[in-house]
Regions:
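Glycine-rich beta-strand-to-loop/alpha-helix junction loops that act as flexible
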Residues: 136, 169-174, 190-194
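Active-site phosphate/pyrophosphate-handling residues
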Residues: 81, 155, 191
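As written
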Residues: 130, 185-187
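Conserved N-terminal beta1-alpha1 strand-loop-helix module at the mouth
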Residues: 1-92, 96-98, 106-133, 149, ...
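Substrate-recognition "cap/lid" segment bordering the active-site pocket of phosphatases
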Residues: 145-156
Length: 213
């Protein structure tokens, strides 16, 4: 089980979230956000953004080291082989990704496994799984994921959370304005991308999230 303190302000990003910058500058930006007080970090890199595999590994290891120095869990999105190779703190899987049982077998009992859920059927199935925490969404429209499902909104989120017994974070299009409403629901925190990557002062936003959850 994942300590719920780690789920309050769960930050997700990769170099592609700073597409206007070089990989090296994007890494610097991500580290600044890590230093703002986020509680967990999920490394999520999408698209052909690296010159070669060595550049990817250099990027991953630098971000992992920064997270370790800050005592922040370093979670790898989707890539189970990478998570095993660098001994990440865990892996986050989507519904179409590797089976949780396989991830557990390869990672061992002490690593974190997260699972994305989008509807009641997936949420109910996840209750019986070995996932340490769930990410439920998208709650609102989001531009951070090109393949995101249709957002289901706050009303359906409340209904879905009634059947949940696991540690869980809300994700998808979360803004400063929606934080107050979400904090009144049985969520352990929020997972955010653009709310922090586009922020001029991420520390203020992180502080607000910690005050609410």
């Amino acid at each position: 089980m994942m300590n719920k303190e780690y789920l309050k302000c769960y930050f997700i990003a990769g170099p592609q979230n700073f597409a206007e910058l070089s990989i090296e500058k994007a890494v610097e930006k991500i580290i600044v956000i890590l230093q703002s007080g986020v509680s967990s970090y999920q490394f999520r890199d999408k698209g052909t953004i690296y010159r070669n595999q060595n550049q990817r590994m250099t990027t991953v290891l630098k971000l992992q080291e920064a997270a370790k120095d800050l005592h922040i869990p370093f979670i790898v999105n989707d890539d189970l082989e990478l998570a095993c190779m660098i001994q990440a703190d865990g892996v986050h899987l989507g519904q179409q990704d590797r089976a949780i049982a396989e991830a557990r077998e390869k990672l061992g009992p002490k690593k974190y496994i997260g699972l994305s859920v989008r509807n009641k059927q997936e949420l109910l199935a996840a209750q019986k799984s070995d996932a340490d925490y769930l990410g439920i969404g998208p709650i609102y429209p989001t531009s951070s994921k090109s393949d995101a499902a249709e957002p289901f909104g706050e009303k359906q989120l409340r209904e879905l959370l009634l059947v949940n017994q696991k540690s869980i974070v809300g994700i998808g299009g979360i803004t400063l304005d929606s934080l107050n409403k979400l904090s009144q629901m049985p969520l352990d925190g929020v997972a955010v991308i653009s709310l922090l990557t586009r922020a001029t002062n991420p520390q203020n936003i992180v502080r607000k999230i910690h005050a609410l959850f």
